[in-house]
Amino acid sequence: MTAAAVPLRPGPGPLPLLLLPLLLLRAGPVRADSKVFGDVDQVRMTSEGSDCRCKCIMRPLSKDACSRVRSGRARVEDFYTVETVSSGTDCRCSCTAPPSSLNPCENEWKMEKLKKQAPELLKLQSMVDLLEGTLYSMDLMKVHAYVHKLASQMNTLEESIKANLSRENEVVRESMRHFSEQLKHYENHSAIMMSIKKELSSLGLQLLQKDAASVPGAPPATGPGSKAQDTAGGKGKDSNKHGSVQKTFVDKGLPRPPKEKLLKAEKLKKEGGKARFPQPTAKPRALAQQQAVIRGITYYKAGRKEMTEAMADNALKGTSWLEQLPPRVEGRLPEPNSAERDEAGGPRASEAADLAPGTPASGPTLTPTPTASPLPTEPPSRPEVPSPGREASCEGTLRAVDPPVRHHSYGRHEGAWMKDPAAKDDKIYVTNYYYGNSLVEFRNLENFKQGRWSNMYKLPYNWIGTGHVVYQGAFYNRAFTKNIIKYDLRQRFVASWALLPDVVYEDTTPWKWRGHSDIDFAVDESGLWVIYPAADDRDEAQPEVIVLSRLDPGDLSVHRETTWKTRLRRNSYGNCFLVCGILYAVDTYNQREGHVAYAFDTHTGADARLQLPFLNEHAYTTQIDYNPKERVLYAWDNGHQLTYTLHFVV
């Protein structure tokens, strides 16, 4: 053990043994952590050796000793020491301390001298002392070692990154070469597939021609209408009427049309024949009427082609309620699309006159006479929305509604999402908010979840509410005015619009959501419906009730025999939906626990009070619509898109 003593000015008095171990530091490879720009370490210890233990003992000068030294009364014990204690086989230790930490008298003497000589340098001296102590406590060699180690690690990391990137680049180049080879193979296969398709199309054409030639009692296949005309009864007037049109396409010596056109013509001919072969011969008028509709599809102008196809499809589907409608009253205001109906109905009226000579012609007035032609006894070949087996399931009533299944969270609090139940695809249509002029289309549910829309329809007007539906390729909605509108999504134009006869609108434009849409469209197994409030003459206290009416999808007309007034009061329910001709109403839209509380049956005209639990998962349901194709409810609840599964009592 070594000790260093610094004597001071001589003074009388005994020497007490005063040892103050203020700091104990154990030596290691490096010294203890020092505080930079903080409190200065009073003792600095350094150690060297593989087996070393060091300890520093500091005995500073007390304040009383300083005062005695200053007054000239110093004692023998007035001194300060720094002792070093070491142990170990291989150890070298050293302890040092700055004079300012051991002898506070020095600082006091310096401060007094500064105050006397240069008072303005007092602040500078204090800063110098602070910097001196800070530099003394810093281990610059240790900082340098850390910086060097960090730099070496950065170099190692840089080299590894370069090596990894080079390997990844090689993988990418190899993948690109592999993909280019696969692309070449795919192009070769594509050429082979195109040649195979051409061969198959030519074989299909030959088979169709052979089938057409093998039909007993049929002339050679010369056009798309020859087979249908023979099946319809072979009347001379009818065949002469369309024979010239057919000869202009095939019989004359014109260049042969492409194979695709021949395939379409043969397919039309085959479909026309299929639509007529199963019909009994005792009903030639109904067959002739259907035949006239098909010819109308074939020979109409291109501008109205899709419109005519939709109307012809409705006629072919054989919806019973459309055929039972009475003749239209002549005093009714003309609808905006009356010219389109005249154009589409012209060929039917003329051909019906040809097939029934005993009936006097009515000139330009087109009055439908559904009682003149018998109804088909067989079920329709193309049902309107569901399969034929689903009509039987409509005999039951609603038994329970399952809790909702959330599919996505999209858009604002209010909105509507829907599918076209008459379409074969899985497109989803969304109207975000309760008024606007946009309809967003998504290819399927997966694209909707990813936010990848495939089409956006900018309507030339503003819609309002959330009671819209998409049905048979058209968007049915209420405009910002009082009109209900059919917007054709294929041709992107307003196909028809109308005013409901007895509807009661709100007093002012609803600039906030009021719980439900005043005009709500619905689609079930029987077709298109509209739900709206109307005046009730039976009760003056509550004059407004909910009316349920079946709509004509073509011209949006309503009829008295397909209109029912319910006892459901306006603003007394949350949302409503229609299933199998039965109207159901949910009692609340902004409470989580709700009930299907009301039902009205259009088949019997009776209503009932129910208590079927209905869960508004997020307590803000702005749309509930039934999809007859999937037999589920589509709902928009506070920006969440949900579906409900239904259970019925058969």
UniProtKB/Swiss-Prot annotation:
Q: Which residues form the Olfactomedin-like domain?
A: 393-650
- Low complexity composition bias: residue spans: 357-370
Q: How is it modified after translation?
A: O-glycosylated but not N-glycosylated.
Where does this protein have compositionally biased stretches of type Pro residues?
371-386
Entry's InterPro entries? Olfac-like_dom (IPR003112), Olfactomedin-like_domain (IPR050605)
Keyword annotations from UniProtKB, A to Z = Coiled coil, Disulfide bond, Glycoprotein, Secreted, Signal
Q: What are the disulfide bonds?
A: 394-580
The site feature described as Cleavage is recorded at 300-301
Output a single Gene Ontology CC term carried by this record.
extracellular space
Residue ranges under compositional bias (Basic and acidic residues)? 249-274, 329-345
Q: Which cellular compartments is it found in?
A: Secreted
Q: Where is the signal peptide?
A: 1-32
Identify this protein by name. Answer: Olfactomedin-like protein 2A
Q: What is the lineage of its organism?
A: Eukaryota, Metazoa, Chordata, Craniata, Vertebrata
